[in-house]
Regions:
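Mature N-terminal segment immediately following signal peptide/propeptide cleavage
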Residues: 49-86
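Charge-rich, well-structured scaffold segments of protease-associated domains
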Residues: 40-44, 65, 123-271, 315, ...
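Short, basic, low-complexity termini and linkers enriched in Ser/Thr/Gly/Pro
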Residues: 3-20, 24-39
């Protein structure tokens, strides 16, 4: 039924609505203005006590160690009828022969696509697709891995397929060639984006161009990899050093028995020799990479960091948040919000598990503001030693970190992955709990002390990737000496005649 007032309100809305709203607003302000202003000034909601976060007690997976040194983690989760698993295998690209840089990446691809003696990769694809299941392999700088997932009803069959791939791969020359072609395509395009260039070359400035952590595949090195190389790598790494994690809807007793049967017969792992990598940090100064097809710059300010075992890591994590961790950080507030010099700015210390991480501040800015943005970012870094930290900054940073910390481990699968990583690097199982407790205890005095200890602006290197004709003439204003130009030309194999010829030779 139509309301008897609907016609009147339509007239008011059409002809007098705006004046009526304005009149109501004026009257409301005259009657309520002092009250509203007083409420704004008092801000009573700020006095509402914020409850303390609950104690952090993640669901612990069951740890089982076999006689041959293989470690198994079982994490039950019966919410959904799925089972997923993975095998983490020590040994990655940092351990490969420099002359065959890229071997581990090729291995990670060809391993899965080649399949096994019982079932080739294409047949495996078809079977898994019919069951909405997955099996994947991959290579990283410190490890390789096999991972799988499936519905609970298919879990036994998919596990058997993954186990066969782990223990009895059949590396196919055609699949290796396909992986080489894909890798080669990535190599010839690696200078397309300034962000990729800046990240890659800044790491070289910190660790060194010949470091195992910055070594990059070239067309010649990936072209030299053979099927025999893949087999040799597999034989070298598969053994009693494995870390296995299973999560999902399974019976733990039956799962443990199945894993023991599958892995207890593998040989005892040989002790790995300790690593003796050298980390000296960057040479202070300014480096430049020309990319004249852009109108913006990627500025990176870098130094050598520390590893996670350092007891100062919790305090540095808080300092990171204050310096460049978000919208309220010093870098964001000054360089972007106040000065309007960058589209994006942030950074701080990163912490690797078994070697020093990198201190890195990144600013993305237009060409015309490159110098001013760099100066502003460097001033905020120096300010860590000259501008006192406040209790407000400390409280906000700790709250942000502790809240995000909980979300990082809010599922059993995430906790399992972290437990595996801690096991891989020999960290204590209660590392997460002690780390959180240390974060809660950080004080303003602690921040001042770590800034003095680790922040040394005179030891930092600066890399600018951008349009040379537009920005290079002004770089002298940074007072960092003569810019060192970095050559990022992609080396071509002898006799290849260029990228197209090099790609053709891999077909």
């Amino acid at each position: 039924m139509k309301s008897p007032l609907s016609g009147q309100w339509s007239v008011i809305g059409g002809r007098f609505g705006l004046r009526l709203l304005l009149l109501v607003g004026v009257l409301w302000g005259s009657f309520n203005g002092p009250v509203a202003l007083n409420a704004q000034q008092n801000k009573p909601w700020e006095k509402i006590p914020v409850p303390k976060l609950h104690d952090f007690k993640p669901q612990e997976p069951k740890r089982i160690e076999l006689k041959n040194g293989i470690v198994i983690f079982l994490q039950e989760d019966h919410e959904l009828p799925f089972v997923s698993g993975g095998v983490l295998i020590p040994g990655g690209s940092r351990d490969e022969d420099p002359a065959k840089a890229g071997l581990v990446g090729l291995y990670g691809q060809a391993w899965r696509t080649s399949g096994t003696a019982k079932m080739d990769g294409d047949q495996l694809d078809d079977l898994l697709e019919s069951k909405a299941a997955h099996i994947e392999t991959a290579g990283d700088d410190d490890s390789t891995a096999v991972a799988w997932d499936s519905l609970k009803g298919d879990a036994d069959q998919v596990f058997a397929l993954a186990l066969d791939l782990l223990l009895h791969p059949k590396f196919n020359p055609e699949k290796l060639q396909l992986a080489q072609q894909q890798e080669a395509a990535g190599i010839v395009r690696r200078n397309d984006e300034e962000s990729g260039i800046a990240d890659r070359e800044s790491a070289k400035l910190v660790y060194g161009a010949n470091s195992p952590y910055t070594r990059q595949p070239e067309l010649a090195s990936i072209g030299s990899v053979t099927v025999e190389d893949l087999k040799a790598w597999h034989d070298r790494t598969i053994g009693g050093k494995l870390i296995i994690g299973i999560t999902g809807d399974f019976d733990p007793v039956a799962m443990e028995a199945k894993l023991r049967e599958a892995f207890e017969s593998l040989p005892q792992a040989k002790p790995e020799p300790p690593r003796h990598d050298s980390f000296v940090g960057p040479k202070p100064g300014l480096s430049f990479i020309n990319k004249d097809d852009v109108n913006q710059s990627n500025v990176q300010i870098m130094g050598l960091g520390i590893d996670r075992r350092n007891p100062d890591v919790p305090t540095l994590a808080v300092m990171n948040e204050i310096l460049g961790g978000g919208f309220a950080s010093r870098l964001f507030q000054k360089v972007r919000t106040e000065l309007g010099l960058a589209y994006e700015v942030g950074g701080g210390f990163s912490f690797a598990y078994d070697h020093p991480g990198v201190f890195r501040v990144i600013a993305l800015t237009k060409s015309a503001s490159t110098v001013e943005a760099t100066k502003a970012a460097m001033a905020e870094i120096a300010g860590l030693n000259s501008r006192p930290f406040t209790q407000e900054e400390l409280d906000r940073a700790k709250d942000n970190i502790l809240t995000s910390f909980l979300f990082r481990y809010d599922t059993r699968e995430k906790v399992l992955a972290e437990r595996e990583r801690l096991e891989f690097y020999g960290y204590p199982p209660n590392y997460l709990e002690t780390y959180k407790a240390a974060l809660e205890k950080v004080t303003v005095a602690d921040l001042t002390a770590v800034a003095k200890k680790y922040v040394h602006p005179d030891k930092l290197a600066v890399l600018v990737v951008g349009n040379g004709p537009e920005i290079k003439p002004g770089l002298d204003e940074l007072n960092l000496g003569t810019p060192h130009s970095i050559d990022i030309t992609i080396p071509m194999p002898k006799g290849s005649g260029g990228p197209a010829g090099a790609m053709e030779k891999m077909q």
